[in-house]
Amino acid sequence: FSTIQNERERLIRAYRKTIRFTAFITLPIMAGLFVTAGPVIRLLLKEEWWPSIPFFQLLCLGGCFTILTAINNNFIKVSGRSDGILKIEYYKIAFTVAVVLLTYREDVLTMVAGLVVTRLLVYIINMIYTAHYTGYRFSMQLMDLLPYAGLSILMTLLLLPIGGWIENQLLLLVTQAAAGTVIYIGTAYITGSKILKDSLELIRKKNCLLYTSPSPRDG
């Protein structure tokens, strides 16, 4: 019994680290895409496509939940309960149908917003199933996500006003991308993010291996 318990705790630690690392990378990228959607689309597409900016922003929000749901699905598969994933898909279909029925008379943006809410609801249900099958509790996963969600929201709030100060779209894109990187990484460093420290340590070790590895001539 103790061996099984130790294995379960080891898996939960691995799950937590995976979720934290995924959130650390994914959430700021999606937030950055949300913020820079305007300059990116205006630079790459013709003016008739500019109204698609809010759609792209909503898809970025929904993408956060989709990625995290996929990670949790892998945890459920590891636990040997793939039937749980099928149950979650039933919820997803039901929510999607409900959103379409409730919003089909509204504009397309409202329908897309409803589908983003669907992804959020599916992710919440997914967290509950993950907790049931793996022991990775709902509250535990929420606490693993909140620091990086908070940093991403802070970054977004600080970057959005820049759009009203710079008219040149290329300069705006570069400024927002650079400022966002500095704000996110800087704040994570100041607050002592363990994932950031682990990532920097991994990069340092890889660089050490790269510079210390023998060349073919030395062989």
Identify the residue ranges that each predicted region occupies.
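Membrane-embedded alpha-helical segments of multi-pass transporters/permeases
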Residues: 30-35, 43, 97, 101, ...
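Specific pore-lining/lateral-gate transmembrane helices of multi-pass inner-membrane transport
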Residues: 1-89
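Hydrophobic membrane-spanning alpha-helices of multi-pass integral membrane proteins
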Residues: 91-94, 147-159
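Short helix-capping/hinge motifs at transmembrane helix termini and TM-loop junctions
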Residues: 36-38, 45-49, 103-105, 163, ...
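Short runs within selected transmembrane alpha-helices of multi-pass transporters and secretion channels
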Residues: 54-100, 104, 108-132, 176-181
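Residue-level signature of transmembrane alpha-helical entry/exit and packing/kink sites
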Residues: 54-55, 111, 144, 148, ...
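Membrane-proximal transmembrane or re-entrant/amphipathic helices at the cytosolic face
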Residues: 131, 136-138, 145, 157-213
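A short, hydrophobic C-terminal helix/tail in secreted or cell-surface proteins
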Residues: 214-219
